[in-house]
Amino acid sequence: MNLNKSNKFVVIDVETTGNRPQDGDRIIEIGLAVVWNGEVTKTASSFVSCDQEIPPFVSRLTGITKDDLIDAPSFSELAPRILDDLDGACLVAHHIDFDLQFLNNELERAGYESFQGNVLDTVEMARMLYPTLDGYRLASLAEQFNLVHDQPHRAGSDAEVTAHLLLLMKKKLYALPFVTLQQLEACTTDTFSGMQLCIYEAMKTVRTSHHKNDSSYAIYRDFALKKPQANNRTQAKVSIPFHAEHFFGKDGALSSISPSFEHRNGQVDMAENVHACFEDGKHLIVEAATGTGKTLAYLYPAVYKSRENEAPVVIATETVALQQQIKDRDVPLLEKGLGLPIEAAVLKGRSHYLCLQKFAHFLEQIRGARQASYDEQLSVAQLLIWLTETETGDVEELNLPNGGYALWEELKSDPESCTHSNCTFFSRCYYPRARDNARQADLIITNHALLLTDHFQETSTLPSYEHLVVDEAHHLEEAAGRHLGASMSYQHFMRLYNQFGVQENAGLFANISVVIDRHPTAVSADWPNERKQELQSLHYEWNQLFNALQTAIVKKDKRTRQKSEGYLPEDVVDTNVFDAWKRVEAGGKDVIRAWRSITRTLKKEALTPAEETLLQKVNTLCNDLEEAQSILASLLTSVENEVYWAESDANKRPDRLRLYRRPINISEQLSGKFFSNTKSIILTSATLTVKGSFQYTIDQLGLTDTQPKCLQLSSPFQYEKQAQLLVPEDFPEIRQDGEERFTEAVAQFLRSLTSSVNGRILVLCTSHQMVKAVSRMMKPHMQRLNYSLFAQGVNGDNRSKLVKQFRNQERSILMGTTTFWEGIDLPGEDVRALIIVRLPFAPPDDPVYMAKAKQIEASGGSAFSRLALPRAVLRFKQGFGRLIRTKRDRGLIFVLDKRIIQARYGKVFLRSLPTLPSVFAPSKELLARADEFFHDGKRP
């Protein structure tokens, strides 16, 4: 294959009756686009007659019906023209395996030979060349690159879009620096399609050019890196005035630079309170309802305090999405309002950052004895291209294949293997650069995990600071519990075991053997075999231990839905478990001792830089194994105020077992090591109060004796005009009428509601079983309703992808649980109706909840009123907040749980919501009301 500009590509796309040509599925439409001399010179498409029925789901997806095929030509009639176009061409498709198997099946049926020429997969090509995209579906790529795609899932349109995508990607490939192309060519030997040949042709072209594309990059030790931005920190930082009313006012700084900016009293109030607490050294809790503009309300006084003290203020969030919003949207807006630059740095834990030294060593390995898997080769290609684009080296920018995250464990930065200034890559290392940026910043944006690590482990990753804002503070207790707890699984041990490379003579064994051969007098020739036997023995004992744990902890009844099983270490550690653990403990120590010994021995020899890196990797792996054994020991040892539980898969397999421990109450730890050690902390979220009181939050976070200032800000939205809360009085109750009848009622109500809403509906459930059951009942009716259904766990688990698919369909239903109750922003027509299926009480078998409840009851309190109810109310408020996101939104909230009206505690939920019309009536009346609401001419 020759990929210069005179080359010929033929892009083919097929629509079919199914996915398996070997089982009789056939092509019903074929599209073709010819690319020649860097241009799309021909497009064509045709229906294809076949003797198979078109399944309803195919018709829904493509719009193709059996009537379209009545006068269509057979494939044998089309074949001569297709083969003529393919003559001498490279065949291209988006998911080449799918299209090629159907094309070859039809060619052979028509009496022709299958296609034997070069092929190219644009999915594989896109994954390599654009490693940071959220997804690689053709429609997503077309949207990303502004390619016209009028008819998705139609062969002609798909083929033409794929052709233009090919040209775009070819242009990017040929613009890559020569050193990157060299590295890519060496590490893509097992790609599915012709990517290595593409890269080779690009290398030949780029090699003959004068500049080799390299001048735009920082070329360092065979890596092409994005040039770091120039450091303009030559001038002293300018102090800023603080005047919230002026800054956020109707004629203030923000309104002058943003026409859409709206003055909000709550925003001014919050900014002034944050400023006052920073000045006075006090803690503040702020519940800022949706629409108050809380982010800017704390960023403005935070920058003021940073400039005044010449020290950074830390902003900690739970989610990556909010960190990116602050960095990319809110800080730039604040800069415009202030008229001066603000230095904001994102800092995460060390394991988020790539270690260039480790990556260079890995590339040496796969050019030598190590056989890289397909996922590893794809990931390496992604990383090489990403290095030309990234400023941060943060893994969260990447969209790696599944196997790529195992590779990341080998390549991430860690303190054990880091040689700091002795490392040849130190001046280019991402982690020290991130820390340096943080030290110079006005604002340090980080996550709850790193924040808590700094406080409880005293790692000092973050620079010294006195003022802190914790956004998404309703997650802080859970994050602290996770941090102070621990977990260990069989799979974690297997990942460590596989890094040694015992089975495939790869990994550490392959590399250490090479080093031993170079230094035969230092180490016995029998050393590798002895170590393999030790590791195989440890692997066997680990299996025995988890089999014993599974027997001791997990219930044998596979029909049970219970995901978690609580346990007490003293009850579990019977003779079998205890003996197995002691053998694992001893075996692990033997392995660690032997491998550390060889590193000490070899360090006395004259080593190459690659060998030194290998020994660092050995030490890191030994440390990881030692830590894993220590964690497992803690999970088998009882500690007061700790809860222990195990989770497994539906089949209760020992190799899927994971053990957990968590503090029951973390209020004392937070009070003693978190709030006491920081001068002023601002806690903020949209959901911190229950029935107007902050007491639950204060108790959970250990602030009872601190007496923080509390501020509750209502939303500027007019809920009484924008929304209604509707509860059907004739709905069955799950406890009285059974889960099956309740689920059927949910599905029936949802089907009836679609005609009234005529738009997007978000359905929030409290269990995955409910999502799957309702989805199953809805599926046969979706074509008749002209609706699309996207259900968590049915159509995938990736929340962002499901939300994107939901938004792309005007008539669609999105069903989810847990993570869908918060953190998704669906303004305007993105969602017109919200259904809360049940009040979101925690599952009664949740181990942490059970332990907390038991502790409360033992002290004479009510677990329901002090724990279950407040938790449920806060989650309910989070779900409620998904509907109205702007002043222009309108929508309906349906609660299908009559307890909100009938139970004595129902009023606690209602009083925690903003004032809005609430109606408790028969389902038919509510559906009629919905029809009137959406068709009364008052749509936004």
Question: Model-derived features: where do they sit?
Answer:
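Conserved non-catalytic scaffold segment of RNase H-like nuclease domains
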Residues: 2-118, 131-153
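Acidic two-metal-ion nuclease catalytic site recognized across multiple nuclease folds
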Residues: 2-4, 168-241, 245-246
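Conserved pre-motif I regulatory segment
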Residues: 238-285
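Walker A/P-loop
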Residues: 279-301
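Signature of the SF2 helicase/ATPase Hel1-core->accessory helical subdomain module
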Residues: 324, 415-443, 447-586, 688-700
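A contiguous, basic/glycine-rich beta-loop/short-helix subdomain that forms a polymer-engagement track
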Residues: 409-442, 452, 457-459, 588-731, ...
